[in-house]
């Protein structure tokens, strides 16, 4: 039988694991239950969550049973890594609705090309809400080491900088450890999966299971997806645009374009992390790439096609492919009215202008520009094209001939930003 752990290591999908020899042994002996938790702290997962999700899917493909724990309770607390802001606690009023949305996203991905796979989705609110404080502190709290929590890097940093740490934050580690104890006791779970920043929480859970249930259990962490500045890609950091899995928040076209623009040095790492293309095929592609038998765009397209298909399905992928072809590889004179209607449903930016709006107004109102000063700057720098013709007048007003089929105008800003104007009959 294929060595699943070695396959995951070959793909650089494992950061740490607690006991490789025994994990391999138990996976050979039987099909196991393993789990990963996802806290519903927003109304969608983002691409950073794809690594652990697809990790679970790989186990599912080998016949093991993934258990997804939606953190309906732990999301109300947050851990030391989550940045707080004024609206932080306010957002959690929506946790119940967010939990359902995230559950549907997870189902679509885990069941991709395998509707019959076994999958269990639970919400830790169901068992944590039943806890009695005295029983919990007496039966569980006595096994949790505050010494270990204080040794966490994020805690040491906060203490050194004299930052406030609430009891609520400490409780997060206790409750996450309790999840593992509960799941081992009631669902026979043997492995917990988490991002590399969750290592200490996973170890706390393992210790708790060992001490109370007297069972040997394990943990595996996956690498984190980081931003260009090295920080963890997450919804709490708005320095760079977050790529969400919900097409209402990040359109399928934007999602597809994100992967099409993957830097050359990350293409093959991402093919290993995010696709089910075999390692032998990836290595062949890599050889062709370095021998210049295929160009970077061809490799990027394979990556974008595969990930978009997994997350959004084949029909949405086809739509994103067609929109990309129309916008980048066809002359605007070659586009039919049907092509424009297709573009209008593809997920590119759409704006319905008023008849008295000039170019600056439209750039700002369509969110192609942040302000009128910014709009003026991009116009004067020759960065704006209207129906593929450069426009340098800051007071330009749209005329009848700018409205293709008396309905559409395509604005392009720079090399990659588009907005389709759809004119109403005034």
From Swiss-Prot:
| Keywords of the record | Aminoacyl-tRNA synthetase, ATP-binding, Cytoplasm, Ligase, Nucleotide-binding, Protein biosynthesis, RNA-binding
Q: From the record, which residues define motif 'KMSKS' region?
A: 232-236
Question: What function does the entry list?
Answer: Catalyzes the attachment of tyrosine to tRNA(Tyr) in a two-step reaction: tyrosine is first activated by ATP to form Tyr-AMP and then transferred to the acceptor end of tRNA(Tyr).
Q: Which organism is it from?
A: Wigglesworthia glossinidia brevipalpis
Give me the residues that bind L-tyrosine, please.
35, 172, 176
The organism that produces this protein has a lineage beginning with: Bacteria, Pseudomonadati, Pseudomonadota, Gammaproteobacteria, Enterobacterales
Q: Name one GO molecular function term.
A: RNA binding
Quote the PANTHER family the UniProt record gives: TYROSINE--TRNA LIGASE, MITOCHONDRIAL, TYROSYL-TRNA SYNTHETASE
Q: Which PROSITE patterns match?
A: AA_TRNA_LIGASE_I
Q: Where is the S4 RNA-binding domain?
A: 357-414
What GO biological process, any one, is recorded here?
tyrosyl-tRNA aminoacylation
Q: Where does ATP bind?
A: 235
Chief location category: cytoplasm
Catalyses which reaction(s): tRNA(Tyr) + L-tyrosine + ATP = L-tyrosyl-tRNA(Tyr) + AMP + diphosphate + H(+)
Recorded hits in SUPFAM superfamilies, A to Z, give: Alpha-L RNA-binding motif, Nucleotidylyl transferase
Summarize the subunit comment.
Answer: Homodimer.
Question: Which CDD domains does the UniProt entry name for this protein?
Answer: TyrRS_core
Q: Which family does it belong to?
A: Belongs to the class-I aminoacyl-tRNA synthetase family. TyrS type 1 subfamily.
Cell compartments where the protein resides: Cytoplasm
**Mind telling me which GO cellular component terms the entry cites?**
cytosol
Pfam families tied to this protein: SYY_C-terminal (PF22421), tRNA-synt_1b (PF00579)
What is the designated name of this protein? Tyrosine--tRNA ligase
């Amino acid at each position: 039988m294929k060595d699943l752990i070695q396959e995951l290591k070959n793909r650089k999908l494992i950061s740490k694991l607690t006991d490789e020899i025994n994990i391999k042994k138990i996976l050979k002996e039987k099909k196991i239950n393993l789990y990963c938790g996802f806290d519903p702290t927003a109304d969608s997962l983002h691409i950073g969550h794809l690594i652990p999700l697809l990790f679970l899917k790989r186990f599912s493909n080998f016949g093991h049973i993934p258990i997804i724990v939606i953190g309906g309770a732990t999301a109300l607390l947050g851990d030391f890594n989550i940045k707080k802001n004024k609206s932080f606690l306010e957002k959690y009023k929506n946790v119940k609705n967010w939990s359902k949305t995230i559950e549907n996203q997870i189902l679509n991905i885990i069941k991709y090309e395998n509707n019959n796979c076994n999958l269990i989705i639970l919400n830790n609110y169901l068992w944590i809400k039943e806890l009695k404080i005295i029983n919990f502190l007496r039966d569980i709290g006595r096994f949790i080491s505050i010494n270990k929590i204080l040794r966490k890097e994020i805690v040491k940093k906060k203490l050194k900088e004299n930052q406030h740490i609430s009891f609520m934050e400490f409780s997060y580690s206790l409750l996450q450890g309790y999840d593992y104890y509960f799941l081992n006791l009631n669902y026979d779970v043997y492995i917990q999966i988490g991002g590399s920043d969750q290592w200490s929480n996973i170890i706390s859970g393992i210790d708790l299971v060992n001490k109370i249930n007297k069972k040997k259990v394990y943990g595996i962490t996956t690498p984190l997806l980081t931003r260009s500045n090295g920080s963890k890609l997450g919804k709490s950091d708005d320095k760079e645009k977050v790529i969400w899995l919900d097409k209402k928040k990040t359109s399928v076209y934007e999602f597809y374009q994100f992967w099409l623009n993957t830097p050359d040095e990350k293409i093959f790492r991402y093919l290993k992390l995010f696709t089910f293309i075999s390692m032998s095929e990836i290595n062949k592609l890599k050889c062709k790439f370095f021998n210049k038998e295929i160009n970077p765009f061809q490799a990027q397209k394979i990556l974008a096609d595969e990930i978009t298909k997994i997350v959004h399905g084949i029909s949405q992928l086809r739509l994103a492919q067609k929109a990309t072809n129309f916008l980048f590889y066809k002359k605007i004179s070659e586009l039919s009215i049907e092509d424009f209607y297709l573009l209008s449903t593809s997920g590119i930016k759409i704006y319905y202008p008023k008849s008295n709006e000039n170019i600056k107004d439209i750039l700002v109102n369509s969110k192609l520009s942040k302000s009128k000063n910014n709009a003026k700057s991009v116009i004067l720098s020759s960065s704006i094209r209207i129906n593929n013709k450069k426009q340098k007048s800051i007071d330009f007003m749209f005329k009848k001939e700018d409205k293709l089929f008396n309905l559409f105008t395509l604005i392009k800003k720079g090399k990659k930003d588009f907005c389709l104007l759809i004119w109403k009959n005034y």
